[in-house]
């Protein structure tokens, strides 16, 4: 008993003192950051379904470090670095989140589940009503996804790392996770955390960007519709989804799990399977998103901050989202010119594929300047196109980048 000291008895404190001031400072910072995320999630400033479990995971993993039997520092949550099969099987019986991580996270399954749920939210009828405008705006809103690659390469990142962080500009968390797992697995944790942190800020940040770049007289434009938009029945939407899924899987088989998951969600929505729809759009989507937040949180141990690339990723993430927002607004102005003034440029911001947040942002801004202007239908069309376009770019990057 006399050999048991305070540091041995309370190993969280003991490992803090034994790990050196740099690692200890990083652990303290991440604990404070986790508490901040919990607070911001509770206040509704960030997405609570992701940020609260992520923040609590950060707190627990950095407080719950202990000394393992071999003398190294570890935890009882999970070990993402395991590759030996026997060691992995042993750890899965000890670390309670290791089975969840190994069987759903590291293979992209959880990202596909989230994407399947997103598919149930998409009414492709809005895209079919104005396909040219929707697709054009979506392409413009990928400006950050394209331009961030050379910027990141200039800052010293490899091409695979650059493409992974550039996908933050697509404003779709599962897409970022899927791409980084395929191209830069050693950086998928910081890249995905950066993506979800910044995506939570789009609802609060993009309105300022729109107001900066779009004068009030343009924001207040009320679009005149000469004829009522055509309503497509479920049969057409289902056929469209099936054909597009087949084409995209044929062209980019490496990203076919994403395409399949997205359009399966759309098919469930349009096929009238109410009980399956309720499951996929509810428990599956929200449960997967919640567990994604949990896993991202417990993966944020102190070594994350010690990676010299983390600062670059933080900067590049915000640059990618900023450029994508600017690109979408530029596309809105081009459509304004093409339509000879009968188009509201604010719709361009909705092409950034954070479903349905950016579409709501567009309508909220427009309604504030002109309560009689309704752009939500056009905004949702651009929004849905943005999701599909981001998935296509993911397929292009994963297919082409390894050969460059």
Would you name each region that the model predicts?
Residues 1-22, 28, 75-93, 208-239, ...:
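Intrinsically disordered, low-complexity non-transmembrane regions of multi-pass membrane transporters
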Residues 24, 124-149, 196, 303-329, ...:
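Entry/N-cap segments of selected transmembrane alpha helices
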Residues 37, 102-128, 266-268, 285-307:
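Hydrophobic transmembrane alpha-helices of secondary-active transporters
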Residues 43-51, 99-101, 122-135, 274-283, ...:
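Interfacial helix-loop-helix linkers and transmembrane-helix boundary segments
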Residues 103-108, 116-121, 135-147, 151, ...:
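Alpha-helical membrane segments and immediately flanking helix-loop junctions
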Residues 187-204, 316-327, 347-350:
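Alpha-helical transmembrane segments
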Residues 195-273:
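Membrane-embedded hairpin module used as a gating/binding unit in multi-pass transport
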Residues 243-331:
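Transmembrane helical segments that form the transport core of multi-pass membrane transport proteins
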């Amino acid at each position: 008993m006399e050999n048991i000291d305070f540091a041995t008895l309370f190993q969280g404190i003991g490992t803090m003192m034994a790990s050196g001031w740099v690692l200890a400072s990083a652990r303290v910072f991440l604990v404070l950051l986790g508490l901040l995320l919990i607070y911001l999630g509770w206040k509704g400033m960030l997405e609570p379904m992701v940020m609260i479990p992520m923040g609590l995971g950060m707190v627990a993993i950095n407080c719950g470090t202990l000394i393992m039997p071999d003398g190294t520092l570890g935890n009882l949550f999970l070990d993402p670095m395991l590759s030996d099969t026997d060691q992995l099987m042993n750890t899965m019986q000890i670390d309670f989140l290791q089975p969840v991580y190994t069987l759903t996270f590291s293979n992209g399954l959880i990202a596909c589940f989230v994407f399947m749920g997103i598919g149930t939210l998409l009414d492709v009828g809005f895209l079919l009503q104005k396909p040219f405008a929707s697709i054009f705006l979506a392409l413009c809103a990928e400006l950050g996804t394209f331009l961030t690659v050379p910027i990141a390469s200039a800052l010293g990142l490899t091409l695979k790392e650059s493409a992974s962080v550039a996908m933050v500009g697509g404003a779709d968390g599962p897409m970022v996770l899927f791409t980084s797992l395929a191209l830069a697995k050693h950086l998928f944790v910081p890249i995905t955390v950066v993506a979800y942190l910044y995506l939570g800020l789009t609802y609060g940040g993009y309105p300022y960007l729109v107001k900066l770049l779009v004068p009030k007289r343009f924001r207040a434009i009320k679009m005149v519709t000469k004829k009522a938009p055509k309503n497509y029945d479920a049969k057409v939407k289902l056929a469209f989804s099936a054909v597009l899924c087949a084409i995209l899987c044929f062209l980019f088989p490496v990203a076919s799990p994403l395409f399949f998951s997205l359009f399966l969600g759309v098919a469930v929505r349009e096929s009238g399977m109410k009980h399956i729809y309720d499951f996929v759009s509810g428990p599956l989507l929200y449960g997967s998103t919640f567990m994604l937040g949990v896993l991202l949180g417990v993966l944020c141990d102190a070594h994350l901050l010690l990676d010299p690339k983390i600062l670059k990723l933080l900067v590049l993430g915000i640059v990618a989202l900023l450029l994508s927002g600017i690109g979408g607004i530029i596309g809105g102005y081009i459509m304004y010119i093409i339509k000879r003034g009968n188009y509201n440029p604010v719709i361009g911001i909705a092409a950034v594929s954070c479903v349905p947040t950016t579409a709501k942002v567009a309508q909220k801004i427009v309604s504030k300047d002109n309560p009689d202007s309704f752009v939500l239908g056009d905004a949702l069309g651009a929004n849905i196109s943005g999701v599909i376009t981001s998935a296509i770019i993911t397929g292009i990057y994963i297919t082409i980048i390894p050969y460059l």
